[in-house]
Amino acid sequence: MKRFHVHIHVDDLAQSIAFYSRLFAAEPARVEADYAKWMLDDPRVNFAISTRGDKPGLDHLGFQVDDAAELAQLKSRAESAD
């Protein structure tokens, strides 16, 4: 299951959960004291927010894969694209 991953640092988790829940028309798949994430299907994105950073904004981007074989395939595609 390949997904693009986006992680954003926010200052106010509750306010941000409310905003993104309205934006995505979905509740988070997981919520912790300092973290929430949505596993969206259209587009296929693992979208996460947390208060675990220095300042609000983009924390990191990535790809989510199920196993080492998918990771190797993705690595090969990235190397071929370069």
Regions found by a protein language model. Name each.
Residues 53-55:
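Short, flexible turn/loop "capping" segments at secondary-structure junctions
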Residues 3, 57-60:
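Eukaryotic phosphotyrosine signaling hubs
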Residues 1-2, 7-46:
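Core segments of cupin and vicinal oxygen chelate
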Residues 37-41, 59, 82:
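Short, surface-exposed, charged/polar-biased interaction segments
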Residues 13, 63-82:
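Vicinal oxygen chelate
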